Structure formats: C-alpha cells, structure tokens
Amino acid sequence: MPRILRAHGKRARLAAILWTATLLGAPAIAGADLRLVPEPASVQEGAGRLPLGGGVTIAVGNDDEDRFAASLLADEIRDATGQSPRIVNGASGSIVLRREPSLTSAGDEGYRLEVKASGATVAARTAAGLFYGVQTLRQMIEPRGIPVATIEDRPALRWRGVHDDISRGPVPTLEALERRIATLAEFKVNLYALYSEQAIAYRTAPLVANPGGAFTPAELRALAAFARRHHVALLIEQQVFGHLDRLLSLESYKALAETPTSGALAPANANARALAESLLAEAATYSSAPFVHVGGDEMTDVGKGQSRDLVAARGVGAVYVDWLTDLDRTLAARGKRTMFWGDFVESHPELAAKLPKDAVAAVWDYSGRESFEARLATFRGAGIDVFVCPGATNWSRVFPNLATAIPNIRGLTREGQKKGALGELTCTWDDNGDALFGLCWYPVLFGAGAAWKSGDYDPEHFRLAFDWTFLRAPGHDAADAIAQVASAHTILQAVRPMDATIELSWLNPARGSLDRQLLAMIGAPALELRRTQEQAIEGAERARASARRNADQLDYVVFAARRLHAIGQRAILAERMKAYYKDALENQRAPDKSGRVLDRLNAILGLLVQGREQSALLRDEYQRLWLAENRPYWLGNVLAEFDRDLQVWSEKWDRLRVATVSFKNGAPLPSAEDMGFAP
C-alpha cells in the first residue's frame, strides 16, 4: 500500500488553512442539544427529560445478545448518575428494549428509539439493531436524565470498519484490541481489519511470525469471539502478492521471491502460489467476517524476475487475474469472499470484467481530491462490489494530518454511498514503526460517523459532538485541542514542502549542517508552532478534568503536542546556539571580554542540557504510551532513535565543555564549522 508522503500544492495548503480555521473558530450549532455520533437519520426533539433517579429498571427479553446490550446501558446509567438500575425480564420497565419483527423500515441494523418523560423504548428487528439503538441511548444519558426525543435510524453502508496495520511496528496487546473494538462498537463500527505481513503465527508456516510480534490462533479466536459479542466482525488481511520482504529474506522462502531482493511472491513459481493458498486457507479460519483480504497492492516487481517469461507470454494483467482467481477459489471453498486492493486493476481497467464476480475491490485513496467518482467507476461498471478505503493520514507523521484526512474520509465515503459501496474502511498505517493508535481516534471516529449517516457528514457536527461521545465531557475542549495539534501540519507546510513528519522530530541542532539547515526553515514559524501546541495541551487538560471515560487517550494528544513543541524548540535552539557561539568567537581575543565569552559558552551548554532533558522526557513518555497499547516487540527500534538523539546532545555537550575548559587555559576556540555551529 503506497503510504507516500507527497508535497502539497497551494490549493491543498489553502484548503488546509480554511479547514483549520473552520474547526477552531466555528460557533456552536444552534439547537444542537443532542450530541450523537453517528448522527441519526431522523431526530425529533421534544420537551423535558426522563429522570434517572432511584428505582430505574431496564426490561429486556431472555436473548443473551439483548441482555448484554442491557448491561452496557445499565453501566452507562450507573456511571452518569451513581444509581444502579435493575435488569428485569419482560416488557415493562423504565426503559424497555424489545425486538419488533414488524419494524421493517429499520432494516437489519436500524432501530427506533423513543424517550418520554415517563419512560423510554428501544425497538429493533434484530439483535444488532437493538444494540445500536442502545449505543445511541447511552450517548443521550446525562446525570439530570435523558432528553425527550424520537429517533429513527439505520446505516447507509452495510459494513463500517477500521483497518489496523499490525505488521510494521506496533503489535497491539489483546486487551488493547478488545478495548478498541468495544469503543468502536459504541460508534456502530461493525468491522475490524487486521493487516498482516507476518503478524500471525500460522500453524502451517511457523517461520512467518517473529517472536513476540504475532497473534496466536488462540488469541485471534478469542478476539473474534469478543468482537462478535459487540456485533463486530474480524477481517484478516494477509498479504500474499507482495510486502513480504522479511519472510522472503529467509533461506526457506527466498526461492519463492520474484527477484532476489523482492518482497513479492513469484506467480510463475508453483511453490510460491502454494504458500499463498496455504496462508489464506488458515487465515479464513480466523476471519469471522465473510471476507479475507489478500492484499495485492503495489505490484511493481512481477515480471522482472522468475515470472518474466510467463508475463511476456500472457501479459501481466492475465497473470494477475489468474492468480487472483485461484486465490478466490481457495477462499470460496471456505465460505469467504476475496477482498483485494484495487490499484492494480485501476491501472489496467480492462481487467475488471475478468475478475471473479464475488470478489470485492478495496478502493483506497488518501487524497483530499474533490471527486472520487473515477476511482470507483472501473469496478462498479463491471459489477464488482467495492469497499471505499480512505485514510487517517497518520503514517510517518507526529499526528494525523486532519486537513487531509477529514475531507478524504468525508468525500470518499460519500461517493461510495452514491455508487452502492458495500462498506467503508478507515485505514491507519504504521509506516516506519513509530505509530500509536491512540493518536487516531478523531479521524477513525469521524469515519464511523460518515459510514453510518446517509449522504454528507458534516465535520462541524462531529466536532461539537466529539468530546461528549468519546469522553463524556461537556464542551469541545478536546476537539479544539486536537485541531490545534493538527494545525502544526499547516504551519509547517507554509515553509517546507512536507507536513509534520516524524523525521522532523529527529532533527537535532547539535548534529550536522543538514539538520541545522532544515531547522532553519522551521525557524520562522517556530514560535507559532510552540504557542499552538501549548494551547493544545491546556485544552486537552481542561477536557481531561471533566471527562468520565477515555481520559487516558488524551495522553496521546498531549504527547503529540509536546513532540511538535519540541520541534519548534529545536529550531529556536539552533539559532540561539549559533548566535551565542558567533558572539563568543568575535570576542575571544579581547582580554576584557573573557567573562562574556564564558557566559556565551555556558549558555550554549545550558541549551544542550535543555535539549537533552526534553528528549529524555519524550522518550520515557513514548515508551509508556507504547506499552499501554502494544507488546514490547519492536519498541526497541524506536527507542534506539531516541537514544541516538540523546547521544548527539551529550556528545556535543562534552565537546563544547572541553573547548570551554581549553579556552579558560588560553587556547583559542574552535571555528564555528569545526564545532558545528556554522550556518
């Protein structure tokens, strides 16, 4: 999957500026008392509230799924009011949850919710519909009661999902994934996709997985069972076309690669195809969704190595279709539909009509383009079902670039609905391994809202509802703080082609000339960058003070703000150290200026200590946040970057300390070039 960082043109920068200004400065929507995500199809607000004093009862039938939904509702009431509702069998209570087979307008996942001052009823045809009605009711509960309202609701898309890269860095703990799934289910997400290159410990291919970095069959089955209880299906994506560089570097598998340096299996190699079919056959047993995703993006190597003759004889398109068809047979025999990334077929549109008719194209596009119609037309015109797959734009960045992600999710999901898409997957990617899921809640939950609501989903409605629905906090301090963190991308794009990428956090003014040159580019907006991140931290802490749930997830927002703040600080330190050393050089030969020279040198030493301390604090916090959601696997690779950064600060401090002592003993100072303080 090409998670490519592209430079943004003037048009994109203008859109980013307008988006940020809108998010930070928009007034509250008049009359929007109900803060709900997703936004229901129909809401009629009334007057008054259903009180939740002592003696609240929740009436529900004997079905285990419905009683589980009732237990979540009881927990919500207890958390909001301190009261402990009773769950009773039957159809009489303060709140009634009931199946209503005649409610055909609700479809398979819709519901009807009616709240009166005397009681509330949630009705649905199915367990899923009742579950989703309860999630809406939970968001309506406040300590002073439930607002009177009538809601009729059903989803726009059958499948509403999140795509989680677990293969190139962070591997979540089972507990963290369960929490994600339970939280996403509150927002009516019903599909969770795990992207694996070698993050599954296959029984049939034990060399695939790295120790400590893979899910066992028992873990995947337990996760699927947990997800099922929350009406979420687990979708396994196992790359079998490419992105298998680590696997194909092993002696046991290197002969299966298209070329000696390729991460792609060779379609001309029977053993390569057998491996792919074996992996997918086992993956099908773990995927509780009706699909298995086979990958298949970025097929750039096929035909360059051992499949050259086959491709020359039949054409790369025919080779691709034959292989996909074989994989489709393997999965169909196990009751699964084949999902595949659509970019190769989009570049060869004549192949669409030759694809297996039950296959599903995952059409990804992470841009903020105005229209996505052409991206879907190739498949829909050939009668192929599609998933639309926008992106959280979190990859290789300190924080998701919301100025790209929100319009992308909004536009692609809206277009998918128009074209009859089967579902939506909001994609998170972990390129370079320095990625934390806790940073992604805002775009991921926006995707949930966009996939459920029919038509366009208003980002302003989402902003005003985010704090309440995710944190149970009044106001919109957290949403505003998130916008301020994300504004770093717009601030930095004003002076450089790229946005706030991870690479910026490793620029060190104590290192070489390239780092100093790049930091000099950031110097102009450094103060603005620091101010906005300080405001973000303050806003996040205000939200934390009133949050009743998920307050710990604000730690990720604050960490991103501190990391971005440090980038601005490093740009400032670079200029100060350069100026101080220049002043020291200019005055070192004046006998009456030795005190001034030492003051300047000591000031630089102090700045170096400041930079090192800041880096150490970020390292410790990063490690804590990583372990709060991930296994220790791979963490050492990121900590090594922090350690190298710390070493740079320390080595420069040591060198300058030697120069300072030497100066005190009569030696001249090294040149600015020699000390690394030159422009």
Positions of PLM-derived features:
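Contiguous, structured surface segment used for ligand recognition
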Residues: G31-R160, G411, D434
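Bacterial N-terminal signal peptides
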Residues: A15-A26
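Short, hydrophobic beta-strand segments that form beta-sheet elements in well-ordered domains
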Residues: V96-R98, V162, T338-D343
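Extracytoplasmic/secreted cell-surface and envelope-processing proteins
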Residues: D66-F68, A201-T204, H243-R246, V302-K304, ...
